[in-house]
């Protein structure tokens, strides 16, 4: 008996052959699969497909001509794929080696070969009782493990699910999504397209998300099912697809963001850093953490301890169950005597986008504690960690966020995760898929590109912008985004070109001028940078930070007196601004005015405010160049090694010898070892 993994390879190879119109090869693979599946109905289907294809080949080889042969090919491929998936499913059920087969077998024990009448009868009889949750789980398993549908079943299940309450609808729609994920079923996808018109926003968001992800998974097959593509015709989905795209990108960024936060925390040098520096690093990391949560990034995606330890989530159907506080096992939590605590829990869930599986796991963890004080403390901590997740979020966005986060957790952490392919394995950038482009408007495309750029995926955003520029008239906004892509890819000259064009279309746009300033500074084109800074100064004559940049630019152009006069002007308005004092010292040093540099550095160090990270480096450079090595070493000692090594370039620009930098490195290392 061939093992399931080998049979899955045979199935995939046969499917690939059929999709490439290598029909004889695909039928050969299907025949190999059928040897493990002695089902007479499927054997007859295979024989009919083979006979039809043989007759077609014979007819054409004899000089026959059939203008509909392409349609016949598509029909035969479609029938062969249907037979292939049906055979693979029956083999899987017969082996009883995984959760899918086990769920189907439990239904068989209850209702025989067709358990639907039994389960539906139980459902009707148990309305309004606590037992209905168990039957609801059976309904889920029934839909999850159901064979491929025909049109009659699509209509029947649509009618049944549509008349259930919103929570039940969500649960059963989830079962249909999971079933279609196991095996491609065009009728189930048509069902999802129909139920996506629901007036219930939660059901609509779930259905549309599942449908889009399934279409992405089965994109190579879509040309054989034209009815699936026409199901979208005339429907205005751009706004909802934009919300979905946003959440899909955020979900992709979640693992990277979570890892980055962990690395930031691990990178804090508690041994060599001062308490103020440690506090500064921790505060900066936590600020970034909260900013990511507000943005919608699922920062705790990989922290799944509660999910893995949950007894409730050991059942597959519970991963797709919308949160329902009426479930019997939750009653102890929500009807405790201390009603304030229960109300607080409701408020937490009501005003957060925390997905259903998280809520169930949180409640289960709380129920394991008998100490109400402990529960209150946990509740406060949990609320503080997730309350920002919905700040300024619109309701529709909340629904899509909860759905995407829930589904992502299912395919990453559920007991079924290792037994089925994730719906997130496909490319989830919607504009890259031709069949979805007609549904996306310009705004959706631009927002997608903005998000990709924001998360440093500019290499993905730029081709989309190029494609959009060929389809529509080029705007200043589009050019700005294209310039930003080139900027982030380090193509500074190309970035200047795009920003310059944007400036021509939308003259004196502040953001565009700021980016040109950055590019010219990087390219050391100081004359052009000065022109841009002067244009910005006209817009904001009292901007002292802009004056600092102007002084820096003038210094590079050798206009030392003008640069220092500007810095002195800034000092008049900010006499004790630590950044201003350090900048004056640093600029004076670069201009060769060591006396001025020494004066302003002493003035800065006399202030009680602790040195910030960049300020510490500037102060160390000044101390070093004016010959105060010991003071410079004290400043350099707590900095990370990579930060110190990066100081080579600015110090060299200030005239500090390369060999002296090597000495400085060894002296710093000795000082760190002594500490």
Language model features with spans:
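TPR-repeat structural position
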Residues: 23-24, 182, 458, 492, ...
